[in-house]
Structures are given as structure tokens and as C-alpha cells.
Amino acid sequence: MAAKDVRFSSDARDRMLRGVEILANAVKVTLGPKGRNVVIEKSFGAPRITKDGVSVAKEIELADKFENLGAQLVREVASKQNDAAGDGTTTATILAASIVKEGTKAVAAGLNPMDLKRGIDHAVEAIVADLKANSKKVTSNDEIAQVGTISANGDKSVGDMISTAMQKVGNEGVITVEEAKSLETELDVVEGMQFDRGYLSPYFITNAEKMIAELEDPYILVHEKKLSSLQAMLPVLEAVVQTGKPLVIIAEDVEGEALATLVVNKLRGGLKVAAVKAPGFGDRRKAMLEDIAILTGGTLISEELGIKLENVTLAMLGRAKRIRIDKEATTIIDGAGNKDDIEGRISQIKAQIAETTSDYDREKMQERLAKLAGGVAVLRVGGSTEVEVKEKKDRVDDALNATRAAVEEGVSPGGGVALLRAIKALENLPTDNSDQKAGIEIVRKAIQTPAKQIVDNSGGDGAVVVGKLLESNEYAFGYNAQTGEYGDMVKLGIIDPTKVVRTALQDAASIAGLLITTEATITEAPKKEAPLPPMGGGGMGGMGGMDF
């Protein structure tokens, strides 16, 4: 077992604090509308330029192992905040650094660390209650656009695009961010349910110019096994022909005689038909087929459920307004499923999302949820260089997460104002002793730092501005760092999602409280390099007379 290096009390805390401050100083420059960039060296490829707090924090690894302990713990704050709210990572880091700094000073002065932590936790609870009480529900698309704009560092086009995407696919819809191949940033919306399986044969194409099969008002047969013969299906096929409507078959596979028969029927004009493979694999395929059946108001034809192909009737087939199939994807538009059944399925998937521990499973379930709930929007981020595209994509990701958080828990005045106003909630908080009071005082100081840092980054004097803001009793009165003017932050469109502010403070206080109450740190002792063996003396024989 490797030897360990152990440090105690103030020596341990001070060295961790140095690491915390190094990380916080690198992250805090990115905060606010005039936040600066951080350039990160990559072991291969071009350097990365970003204004995203968590991306900066994740890159920091310090040489001193004790300093690195502190840096890694605060890095955890940024990561946790990113997972919980997707934005506000810089704010969380600044808050954590401030609480750790003031808390370490207090412990060095002889205050009880456990009482300090209780005071900090008490203060955080009071502030969270205040934030929730003053949170304003997001109702208009303009407000959604404003939240997106603020999180994208003042880029209005990004805010507007996210607002449009949410309008199109609903709050439950999936919005993904991809890198575009062009200079422009654009929004692509796919309405209805789309899955990544195309037609099984080009003979099913109805529009030769666009190379797609479009079927209006079709019947949909959803079958979980392979189809190699159509013999068992003849009764239902004949029933569909009688109606004069097209038929779409979604099955594990359609092959051999079955596929040939369908193609011949299509070419002769007897039956308008198209066949596609079922999406997904294994259990996920079955779940997606059930989703399709519920969305279209049909029944999944499965022998496990005791339904055989020969017994299928028209009533068991799904319906949709239109189905569009190209080489790689199938889109079902306006499925005729029962609204209550679809809502029930959505609730079921939401419950599964809440229970799953796998990020991959969660992502796939969220995709299924969106497809049932109404659509998928893709934001394609463009730019003239790869570095620019990556930097912009970071901002768009943040903006998207912030707007989702705003829809969930409402909005508060931005620019650090919501936390400043929460100082009132700390007045007259009951405490058991003076050390707990000191813990509350530490939080009071910390919640002023985000507003101060935003002003400092914009070239102003943070302490002066914060002093002026605290003199006012108006809840939304704040400082617009973009223009250098004071005013009502909500009217100016400078708003933050309440969830982002709340989780930033909670995550910061959680880790900072642990750092303050640390009494010993253990790291691996640096290995002593063994001295190199002496070089053999005496020179090499037989080298005399050589001319160099």
C-alpha cells in the first residue's frame, strides 16, 4: 500500500481553500453578459474557447494534491448544478467559494464548525422559501425567450429560437442541440412521432421526385414478430382493400414472400401499402411498438397477448392523418389514439424516468415521452470555425436548460438580484447560539457575491452597485450590466429561472458545509524518484584515433 500524506485542522483547510479559490477564480470570469472567455488546451485538436462554468471547472486538475482536493469538491458543485438545472454552474461555484472562504476564517477564529454549518443550513432554508414565495410563473413566449437570451449571454436570436421550438413541440417535447455544417443557426421541427427506420423497399415510394412514400389517412398494423408469409393476414388485407385506404405495416421485419407480395400488390394498384421495420431493439422495441399502437389507437399484435394474425380485425389497426416514410425515417402525423390513453402512457413513462438510475435509459425514455407528447425540435448551431461552433453550442445548451427550468418553477429577477433581496429573509432568524448566527452571516455575505461579480466582469465597481441595490426596497430593482443602467429587472427582460438560483445555493452550501467541517485530509505521498545509477567509467576501448 502506498504511503499517505496526512494534514490536520487549519493546515488541511487552508490548503483546500487555496484549491477552491484557484478553481473559482478561473470560473468566475465567465459570469454575466460581459463575462470573458476561458481558453482550454486540448491534448489533440484546436483549443476550446468557452463561457460555460462547468466546462471550465471540469478541466481543472491541480499539481498540489491537497489543493486539488478542494478544487475537486467545488468542481462537484458545478457538475451537480449542471445535472440538476443545466445552468447556473458559475453562480454555484462562486457561492461555494465564498462560503468556504468565510467559513474557514471563522473556524480559524475558534468558532464551532458544526454550529456554523447548522447556521448555514438554516439560512439556506430561509432563502429557498423566500425565492419560492417570490417566484413568478412563466406564461408568455416572450418570457421564455428572455430566459433563453440571458442564459446565452445576451444572444437574442438563441432565446427566440428556443421559444419557437418550445411553442412547436410543447414543454414535454424533446429539443436537441446539434452542430450544423453551415454558418447559420437554424431550427428544424419534426411534428408527430418520428423513428429512425425507412421503407423496406424503394417500390413503396409514392413521390419519386422526393424519394418518399406519403400515405394519407392510412390504417396501421403494428406487429412484433417477423412477417415472411401473408397467408395469415389475408382476411385483414382484404378488409383494408374494401375501405380503399392505404396500409402501413410496422413489424420486426417483412421478408421473402411477404415483401414480394406487398410490392406486387402496390405496383398493380390493388393495395396502397408500405412496410417498415420496427424501431429499437429488445425490450425497448416492444415498448416503442406499444407507444405507436397507443398513439394511433391500434392494438399491438403479439402472440404473448394471445392475438394471432389470422384473428386481426380492422378495429385492431391504428389510424393516422398522414404517414411520411423516407429512406431513413418514418413520421406518423396526427395519430388517432385516445387522448386519455396517450396521457396515461405519458404518465407511466414519467414514472419510469423518475425511477431509473441509468442515464442512457433515462435519455431514451425522454425521447419516447417527447414522441408521444408531440414532437422533436433540433437546433442546429452554425459558425465559421469549429471552435466558434463549440463555444456557441455550450451557450445554446445552457439557454435550453434554463428555459426548461423556468417553465418548471417560474422566474425571479436576474443579475443576482433575487439572492440580494433574500437577505431580508435572514433578519431575525432564531438561532441557538452566536456561532449559528455567524453561519447565517456567512451566507448573507455569500449571496451578495454573484451580483458583485457580474458588475466586476462588466468593468464596474461591484461593491458600490450592490450597496446601491440594497438601499432600494423594490424587489426587482437591479443593475443591467449590459447597458450600465439601473431599473426593474423583470421589465428589462433580465430574469433567471428560480430553479437555477435555488439549486445553485443549495448545492454550494452542501459542499461548502462539508469543507468547513473537515478536520483531516489524506492524500497519497509523492513517490521519491530513485537516483539514477552512476555511469560506467573508463571510456570505451578501441576508440582512439577517431576523428569527430
Curated annotation (Swiss-Prot):
One of its GO terms (cellular component) is cytoplasm. This is Chaperonin GroEL. The keyword ATP-binding applies. Keywords: ATP-binding, Chaperone, Cytoplasm, Isomerase, Nucleotide-binding. Belongs to the chaperonin (HSP60) family. Forms a cylinder of 14 subunits composed of two heptameric rings stacked back-to-back. Interacts with the co-chaperonin GroES. ATP binds at T30, L31, G32, P33, K51, D87, G88, T89, T90, T91, G415, D496. It comes from Beijerinckia indica subsp. indica (strain ATCC 9039 / DSM 1715 / NCIMB 8712). InterPro entries: Chaperonin_Cpn60_CS, Cpn60/GroEL, Cpn60/GroEL/TCP-1, GroEL-like_apical_dom_sf, GROEL-like_equatorial_sf, TCP-1-like_intermed_sf.
